[in-house]
Amino acid sequence: MAGNLYLVSTPIGNLEDITFRAVRTLQECDLIAAEDTRHTALLLQRYDIRKPLESFHAFNEHSKVEKLISRIKEGLNVALVSDAGTPAVADPGFLPLRAALEAGLEPVVIPGVSAVTV
């Protein structure tokens, strides 16, 4: 049974501006693919989330997207996060989103705080 790709929105500035659903998703996933692992590590540390963390950014996404999709097809639940905001909007993430859709997967978007309200 295939896992899921979760596009998890992260805080824009204040680490406390994250939704309960986003924290739960990060806690329950098998792997977190992050635009900047150092930046994301601070968020994970703040919420005591201990999951494998891999870099997935504009400079390596072309070489990593197939493996990421294969892992999801094998049953892993993968959370994709950017440094701030929603992946695939103005950040890396479009490529894995498109690849997931082409593979017949149904990515799940975990919305967050809007820049308009921050």
Across the structure, where does each feature detected by a protein language model lie?
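Glycine-rich, flexible N-terminal cofactor/catalytic loop recognition
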Residues: 1-59
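Residues that form or flank phosphate/diphosphate-binding pockets in enzymes
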Residues: 17, 63, 91
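Short, glycine/charged-enriched secondary-structure capping and boundary segments
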Residues: 21-23, 46-49, 68-70, 92-97
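Amphipathic alpha-helical transducer elements in NTP-driven molecular machines
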Residues: 37, 62, 113-116
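Generic short alpha-helical segment signal, independent of protein family or function
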Residues: 49, 61, 73-77
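Glycine-rich, highly charged phosphate/nucleotide-binding loops
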Residues: 60-69
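Short glycine-cluster motifs
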Residues: 73-118
